[in-house]
């Protein structure tokens, strides 16, 4: 719906305050069946991350800084889909597609904040491995909470400032073109494109802000792991066991980065992706890492795997 004058121009300062999320609308009645795979994914996400968080909290063997960081990642992986997927499921099942401007801006903020925070967490994990492998004698000194805060405060402030700026600028726009967003949740550029005024600044910051954060973190992560691998190669084969967790972090980082870049490029450049494919990639960016990060860490990290097997045996005994 668009409110216009006879000449086809927007009436006064009219601005939509509610929007329709029409992701996958071209599927028609088949759209309802999307409830099943997305419900199974959010269920997997909730169960896998909850188990990982429970293990790290309750098992003393997993109370080292490395596992605490993995636990924080699991919390982020659990929270991020909560701001998006429940609304999607209601939309698929009952066609409840409307969202207020405030709700839309909140979704944008939390999705982008958690996304950039995950990137920053991977940076902290690389620092943890750097100190553990390259500076083992001073590891506990650097990883004490008071010492480690100096590494984490600056990235958190950076992420908050970038995301608050993006959301604040988007919230000041007038939306009088239409109120339909071709997505299953509110995405920054999807909302900005509906504005009936100049959005150059929004477009520039929307492109550069998250990209700069992810790129900066990726550069520091790459440098850290390059130093780690060089150090391990010089020290001999016996040290290769120490970088197993590094490889796990790299797998998680690569998996997340590929999904982020695919979703980023599909929405912000001219390409052959259909609207449904673009929406699919964006929803997978929110869901896939959250579902499979705890599984990757559980399978590849020996300490977590052993604690999970102990928990499984304990539950099995209680069930008998």
Predicted regions mapped to residue ranges:
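Transmembrane helical core of 7TM receptor-like proteins
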Residues: 1-320
